[in-house]
């Protein structure tokens, strides 16, 4: 299992719902946690390792969990701006405006229906990873000028021409 980077089609593809929570999925989720922690991340979505299924994992502020088929059911009108990065776009950071709080329903690794009301950094990580499931990158959430600048910086870091 390897990280996928900006330019890979899986990062801009809408993910499919998980049909069954089984041992194979649990093993995949364990691998996701290993990749995320190995890269020093706090969240990782399945498309970032090449599988376009609706799963992400988080490890932030003592909240360590997998979200299977998550649905954001509510988001606060109050927003906050915070610098975000992404394991799939290394060394690029930009401020992103997002709702401060979200409510999420999801299945856990045992297929149990769960819900969480998140705020602060946990809410931000959930929203960032949830976006991946819809083929949205954090750079899609910023203005065009900043996005173009970030893409130029990324291309220079990757040694490519865009």
From Swiss-Prot:
Q: Where is the active site?
A: 129
Protein's UniProt keywords contain Iron: yes
| InterPro entries named in the record | Peptide_deformylase, Peptide_deformylase_sf
- In which domain of life is the source organism classified? Bacteria
What cofactor is this protein dependent on?
Fe(2+)
Task: Name the protein family.
Answer: Belongs to the polypeptide deformylase family.
What this protein is called in its record is Peptide deformylase
Q: Which gene encodes it?
A: def
């Amino acid at each position: 299992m390897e990280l996928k980077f900006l330019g890979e089609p899986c990062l801009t593809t809408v993910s499919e719902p998980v049909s069954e929570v089984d041992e194979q999925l649990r093993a995949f989720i364990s691998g996701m946690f290993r990749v995320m922690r190995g890269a020093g991340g706090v969240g990782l979505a399945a498309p970032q390792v090449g599988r376009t299924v609706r799963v992400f994992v988080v490890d932030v502020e003592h909240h360590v969990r997998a979200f299977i088929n998550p649905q954001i059911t509510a988001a606060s009108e109050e927003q906050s701006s915070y610098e975000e990065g992404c394991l799939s776009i290394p060394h690029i950071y930009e401020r992103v405006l997002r709702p401060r709080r979200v409510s999420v329903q999801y299945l856990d690794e045992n297929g149990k229906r769960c819900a969480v009301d998140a705020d602060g950094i946990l809410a931000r990580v959930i929203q960032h990873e949830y976006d991946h499931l819809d083929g949205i990158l954090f750079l899609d959430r910023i203005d065009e000028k900043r996005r173009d600048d970030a893409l130029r910086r990324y291309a220079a870091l990757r040694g490519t021409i865009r």
